[in-house]
Amino acid sequence: MKQTLLRRAGLALDMWHLFRRQSQLCRWLQLTVSDAGAAAPANKVEARWLGKIRIGTCAHHALLVPFGSQAAYRFVAPPRSRLVAWCALAGGGSQHGNVEFVATVRNRQQGQERAARLRLSPSQEGADRRWHKLVLELENGEEQQIELTLATRTEMEDRVATPSALWGEPLLEWPRPIGELRGALRVAGPLARRGSFVAAARTLRGHLSEGSYHSLYQIWLREHALSPAKLADMRRRSTSFPYRPLVSVVTPVYNTDPRWLRACIESMKSQAYPNWQLCLADDGSTRAETRALLREYESDPRIKIKMRGTNGGIAAASNEALTLADGEFVAFLDHDDELTPDALFEAVALLNEQRDADVIYSDEDKLDLDGTRTEAYFKPDWSPEHFLTNMYTCHLMVVRRALVERVGGFRDGYDGAQDYDLVLRLLDQTSRIHHVAKVLYQWRRIPGSAAAHEGAKPRAHDAGARALEDYVRRNKLDAEILPGALTYVYRIRYRIKGEPLISIVLPAVPDVGHRDRRNACERMLNMLVEGTTYRRFEVLLPVDRGRAADLTVNIPQNLAVREIPMDAAAMRGRVRQQKRAAADATGDHLLFLDWGLQATDREWLTALLEFSQQAAIGAVGAKLHYPDGSLKHIGIVLGVNGVAAPAFHLHPRSSLGYWGTAVAVRNYSAVSGDCLMTRREIYSEVGGFDDEMGGLADVDYCLRLTRAGYRVVFTPYASFVQDRSWHSIGETDGREGNSLQTRWRDRLARDPYYNSNLSRDTPDYEPALTTSSSVE
């Protein structure tokens, strides 16, 4: 009984911490390194992530910051944040003197600094080596632009013999919005009601912790495991495919650990689809074991090997391997990664359905050194605007060989981003790009590799930016390339063509008897005067014909507002009001806004217009969040609970979303009508909003746009705060949901921008499980 009570008390303490705080890991942010002012040793190495390291009884992802250097991160810190990090010494422990860990936080807006220090002695630590916790509270109760600097210093003269000073998993913590607990409570609630306190607490803890996604993915893997019977069936079906092209798999090799190179080659030999060829080009390896292992496989007629005399880089080696290829299609496999046994089978199965496909890509995951599969990336179908911000297609990629040869293969000077550069050039030749929604490729997480940490190869990020600049020049786009919020994420900022007129369409002024609501309305009108750098717009405001002179808010004198008188019947509902007002608009673009919005910067109107002006784009939406810092909208996911819901609703504003969905331009099936820009000619072409759809009219409108061949885009560069008291997306009555289901049943069943392996129970990008399992 006593042990049970203690266990429950421990779980309760854990849950209390998780309820109070959430966190963001610094290792997912872009890392910059500079000298810290101290003399650096001649053999200094760069700061880098080393993977998970166990010291004592605890293990943390370790960041090595050499003496004389400092590592820095920049991010937005929510109100009441704190920095938490762990420090440890690894290596020899006989020296005397101290090693000092210094964490400094600087408010980039106000210039204020705070620092926390921890001193460890190698001689004392030698007997009781462990991770030490360091906490730095951020005093300001408001959101801050923060720069975090991590540095290590030592008094010892012999730095070579000094133990390594490691930072363990620096993270930012802040109070958790109560709304984020909704999904977790929905998962754990049934267990609690059945009296299983421990199971409910563990499930809730797993759902709220960083490890929850990993745990869910392990369950997903068990449910989708390839049994011997399934593989045998694939081998049988492969022989009956009407179309059985030879697929040449291209792999450049350089000083690869023989363990991983053997695993890579054996993954090819395990393919269920038999008509393949492996083309290996060794790029002048100096490691004898690597070359010896390649020679072991020379006798296999399916494997062609070329030994280069000199090292020319990954592009040169890949091109050498391409010269060995005989297949109609080529696939790309890195020398330390693996294909799943069904990889080529699934690619050829798609080719039998889509004979004109030129490019095929699949989902992927990561493979830890101990063989654990983790970090699944369930990708959307082909998303052009998404791809121009990030090489999301990545692995596995299968391409028609003639097309690769037509664009000249891989180019020198883009190592690390050579595949991104290749696909950007392929886009000049084809749009026949298809997605296999299955995990067919496994990146091995080797310390120092891009798979282990995306900041491991900063030159690759720069090469990707150059490839994107080349794409912009080739296609004569009037745009510039800017850095994105994450490594390997970019922003193409398009310049505005001419000076088109924007018609800003508002709903009627609501009942603003409450002073706070009236002030919110007036602040929004003032934002239109002072809060934008783009000035050519008109404002349309529906008014009750019988009460046109009775507006309850003050309109700024220098804001030209055109009132649209309506009969009382036409005033019923926001959609009906804006639809009637849009009919009187004269602008080239329509911008539908709800009340209560406040832009976070002055470029918001230009950020929307740069996409709305593009011929292929039908609608563009903005990033919306609540005053408490929780997200309201970054795009809408179809099929959630049978209808639709905003992605990552009520997650913290600083959330990156799923693989950066919240901080970069993305394609979605729909965006919120609370802030939606569309060209007036397109609006007329598809029939505008359907007022019978009520609160789901925005989703219905976007689906009619995509049916007409237009794309819908979300941009985080137009960002607003909106009070909770205004129209809330996702909150509709059952009649509207039934109407949407009747009209769009097939589309709601499959959202091309939300992978079929993701759950429709929530819009949070969690793996879809077919069995009910608690998360340990």
What positions do the PLM features span?
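C-terminal, non-catalytic tails of nucleotide-sugar-dependent glycosyltransferases
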Residues: 4-9, 18, 25, 182, ...
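Gly-Asp-aromatic-enriched flexible segments
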Residues: 5-187
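Nucleotide-sugar donor-binding/catalytic module of glycosyltransferases
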Residues: 201-456, 470
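Short, acidic, metal-binding catalytic loop of nucleotide-sugar glycosyltransferases
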Residues: 266-275, 521-536
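Glycine-rich, basic loop-to-helix element that forms the pyrophosphate-binding segment
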Residues: 308-325, 567-585
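A recurrent flexible, glycine/aromatic-enriched loop bordering the glycosyltransferase active site
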Residues: 315, 323, 373-402, 583, ...
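Conserved donor NDP-sugar-binding/catalytic core segment of glycosyltransferases
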Residues: 342-374, 597-643
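A short, conserved alpha-helix in the catalytic core of glycosyltransferases
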Residues: 403, 413-439, 468, 604-608, ...
